[in-house]
């Protein structure tokens, strides 16, 4: 654990130093892009390249920062129905099928749970899903949420990589959503997994365990 914490501290220092160097480059080149002395001249292409590269580097460093700076976990009894209702409000164009059985509350971090479920549903929507099914079951050992969607199925070779940091099949994706979500679940004493077999009638099922 101490080794992991040391690496996290080192990463925080490095990201801070890199951002200190990149931010002024990004600001200065952005200012020059619209100026008369650059626009339409041979300099414009070079400055645009520097600006785009600095923006990409900033986004990459920010992704690393998110991976190493999980907020403090605040476990409390949260209203599961309210959590799901908030998701439905965020994605009104999806058709929702909800079966929470007798699971009314979860002992979890509210903001983390919201982000985890939002990441899962966001990915489903981006994969072309039209239907989302959320079911909850409680046993003596744990509470399990299953989130299923009918979007484009995840290929077997991709399924092995979905929780790997920075792995993405999207042209503009950062590849940290599911990895960060799993970290959040583990920080709460739970887990996030991709089911080997999707629920009947759906293409993909994620399982949240607490």
Write out the residue ranges for each language-model feature.
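Short alpha-helical Gxxx[C/S/T] motif in the catalytic ATP-binding
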Residues: 177, 181
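Glycine-rich ATP-binding loops of the HATPase_c
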Residues: 189-197
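Conserved micro-motifs of the catalytic ATP-binding
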Residues: 69-73, 105-108, 169
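Short conserved segment of the HATPase_c
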Residues: 154-165
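Conserved catalytic submotifs in the C-terminal HATPase_c
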Residues: 97-105, 111
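Short beta-strand/loop element within the Bergerat-fold HATPase_c
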Residues: 131-141
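Detector for a conserved hydrophobic position within an alpha-helical segment of the HATPase_c
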Residues: 185-186
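Conserved DHp (HisKA) dimerization/phosphotransfer helix of two-component histidine kinases, i.e.
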Residues: 28, 41-93
């Amino acid at each position: 654990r101490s080794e992991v914490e040391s690496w996290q501290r080192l990463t925080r220092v490095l990201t801070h130093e890199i951002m200190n160097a990149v931010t002024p480059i990004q600001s200065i080149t952005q200012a020059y892009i619209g100026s008369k002395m650059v626009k339409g001249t041979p300099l414009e292409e070079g400055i645009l390249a520097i600006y785009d590269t600095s923006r990409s580097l900033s986004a990459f460093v920010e992704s690393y920062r998110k991976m190493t700076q999980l907020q403090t976990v605040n476990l409390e009894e949260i209203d599961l129905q309210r959590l799901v209702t908030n998701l439905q409000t965020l994605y009104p164009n999806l058709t929702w099928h909800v079966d929470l059985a007798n699971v009314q509350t979860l002992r979890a971090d509210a903001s983390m749970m919201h982000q985890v479920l939002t990441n899962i549903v966001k990915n489903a929507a981006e994969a072309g899903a039209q239907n989302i099914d959320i079911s909850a079951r409680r046993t003596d050992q744990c509470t399990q949420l299953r989130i299923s969607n009918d979007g484009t199925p995840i290929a077997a070779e991709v399924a092995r990589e979905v929780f790997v940091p920075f792995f993405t099949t999207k042209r503009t994706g950062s590849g940290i959503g599911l990895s960060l979500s799993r970290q959040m679940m583990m920080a709460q004493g739970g887990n996030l997994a991709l089911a080997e077999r999707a629920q009947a009638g759906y293409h993909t099922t994620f399982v949240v365990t607490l």
